[in-house]
Design a protein with these regions (language model features):
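Tryptophan (W) side chains
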Residues: 8-11
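Conserved core of the PLP fold type I
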Residues: 69, 162-303, 320-338, 462-463
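N-terminal mitochondrial targeting presequence
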Residues: 69-99
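Conserved core segment of the aminotransferase class I/II
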Residues: 93-94, 114, 236, 333-432, ...
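N-terminal small-domain helix-loop-helix segment of the aminotransferase-like
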Residues: 100, 110-201, 208, 393-396, ...
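Helix C-cap/helix->beta junction micro-motif
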Residues: 130, 237, 307-308, 429, ...
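Conserved PLP-binding catalytic core of the aspartate aminotransferase-like
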Residues: 143, 409-416, 420, 428-476, ...
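PLP-dependent enzyme catalytic core of the Aspartate aminotransferase-like
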Residues: 221, 270, 454-462, 470-526
């Protein structure tokens, strides 16, 4: 009790009756006049005995002051600890005060309101069970190319200084090769110090861009379906998402639909631009649809961005995965667009090493300098060894680029074969895949199975595709992602008859998928 004795004078002073300067009743211990100084809560007044108050003080160490939202803290504390009078206080009293403080303070920042629930957690957990073929998550389940693995091994076992910090905005050999490689593709003279920022994955690049450019009340145009982080990142920056949907053309009898049939309405898109529009985010090839925006579509977007002085955030992480002879065009390469475009890339998607978490942003210095500020004061630095491995991998690819030995060429060819395999297999059970032009993904229409399906469990307000995926995981052993989560809340009900499949998987995974689909087909009967 030595600690209690040492501080008892402070407690006594806190509880001593004090009179207003002009006379009047003494204040209740713990009372706080509006705008006045905080007053310690008096345990002796609350509990009645010096020993009990000393024990409470010894546990809590300092007087407890609650926020100004309560005019009479003592009255509230008396209500909480009333049942403890005459009893040993201990942890119970602490718990009471912790509960009171919890009620008095808001812990969650308001910018997280409405975005604290993430459906991915649930679907990933369901798909991680044994014997589930996980076609939901977007990562390859096969090794990166041998040259990339060797590059990482060199980085880990070679120069010991690669264990230390490097330049905050990017490991110099990496920023140089990115500037050289993409400068030729974009037709720009890219300065590796001013026009390149290396980030913790493309996710980090997106977050940094939103934080650097989007202010309170700014509007960001998002094209639906969209990679799901675009909306919460806009909200966390204080912006307002403005959605515009790609509209599918009517289905053609006997033919599979293509994602090229999903188009923007030029009039609707133009109507979304206002004086408050700060940015438009463009994902091509897109996730989840796999759409590769045509040059004509990009020119429409570019003209509107220039007309309204809007920044384009171009998420191009799947640029090397384009199928059936389609061509990826970077919007930054169009006339007048380099100076207002941030182009985002991913080493994980480029070299099939998503766990490396190395991404980058390319853009004009007038924009990049603001991303540098955010990066410097948040992430500061990305792992040096991973950056060194990516730099060496790009150097290898640059020597083979455009040749049959190029990894980009070989990976694209293998991914197209996997895409075709998965589409044939899905059709065998009555699903109608939408042919993707690029990316890791395809979406498939599940409408035709509705008549053959049992009533699916789940809440009545839960989108149909969400209930379908849960049923499919549990009953068919196949994991996928409902497409409705890639839409804003008002539009989900219009697109809840699609699911997303990742087809960039190992051959053994695709064979396991085939077995489960064949069993499903047998159960459906003729």
């Amino acid at each position: 009790m030595e600690s209690a004795g040492k501080h008892w004078g402070a407690w006594e002073g806190a509880r001593a009756p004090r009179h207003r300067e002009e006379g009047g009743a003494p204040e209740t211990p713990g009372m706080r006049e509006p705008g006045g100084p905080r007053t310690a809560v008096t345990f002796r007044a609350l509990l009645g005995t010096r020993s009990e108050a000393s024990e409470a003080e010894e546990e809590l160490s300092v007087p407890v002051a609650l926020g100004g939202m309560f005019k009479n803290v003592a009255a509230i504390c008396l209500h909480l600890v009333g049942p403890l009078r005459g009893k040993k206080t201990g942890a119970s009293l602490t718990q009471c005060f912790h509960q009171t403080l919890t009620m008095a303070k808001r812990l969650q920042a308001r910018r997280l309101d409405g975005i604290d629930y993430n459906p991915w957690v649930e679907f990933i957990k369901l798909s991680s069970e044994d014997d589930i073929v996980n076609l939901g998550q977007g990562f390859p389940d096969f090794p990166p190319p041998a040259f990339a693995v060797e590059a990482f091994q060199h980085a880990v076992s070679g120069d010991f200084m690669l264990n230390q910090y490097t330049t905050a905005f990017g490991y110099p050999p990496l920023t140089r090769i990115l500037a050289s490689f993409f400068g030729k593709l974009l037709g720009q003279e890219i300065n590796p110090r001013k026009n390149v920022l290396v980030t913790v994955g493309a996710y980090g690049a997106l977050f940094t861009a939103f934080q650097a450019l989007v202010d309170e009340g700014d509007e960001v145009i998002i094209i639906e379906p969209f990679f799901d982080c675009y909306e919460p990142m806009t909200l966390m920056a204080g912006g307002r998402p403005v959605f515009v949907s790609l509209k599918p053309s009517p289905t053609r009898d006997g033919e599979l639909d293509s994602c090229s049939d999903w188009q923007l309405d030029p009039v609707e898109l133009a109507s979304k631009f206002t004086s408050r529009t700060k940015a438009l985010i463009l994902n091509t090839p897109s996730n989840p649809l796999g759409k590769v925006f045509s040059r004509a579509e990009l020119e429409l977007v570019a003209s509107l961005c220039q007309q309204h002085d809007v920044v384009c955030i171009a998420d191009e992480v799947y640029q090397w995965l384009v199928y059936d002879g389609y061509q990826h065009v970077s919007i930054a390469s169009l006339p007048g667009m380099w100076d207002r475009t941030l182009t985002i890339g991913s080493a994980g998607k480029t070299f099939s090493a998503t766990g490396w978490k190395v991404g980058w942003v390319l853009g004009p210095g007038r924009l990049l300098k603001h991303l540098h500020t955010v990066h410097q004061n948040s992430i500061f630095h990305c792992p040096t060894q991973a950056q060194a491995a990516v730099a060496e991998s790009f150097e290898w690819e640059q020597l083979h680029f455009g040749q049959p030995s190029s990894y980009f060429v070989q990976f694209q060819q293998a991914s197209q074969r996997s895409r075709d395999h998965v589409m044939r297999s899905l059709q065998s059970v009555g699903l109608r895949p939408i042919i993707p032009q690029g990316s890791y993904f395809l979406i498939t229409d599940i409408s035709e199975l509705k008549s053959k399906m049992p009533d699916l469990p789940g809440a009545t307000d839960e989108p149909y595709d969400s209930r379908f995926v849960k049923w499919m995981i549990k009953n068919k052993g196949l994991g996928a992602i409902p497409v409705s989560i890639f839409y804003s809340a008002p539009h989900r009900k219009h697109f809840d008859h699609y699911i997303r499949i990742c087809f960039v998987k190992d051959e053994s995974t695709l064979q396991a998928m085939d077995k489960k689909l064949q069993k499903w087909k047998d159960e459906l009967g003729p």
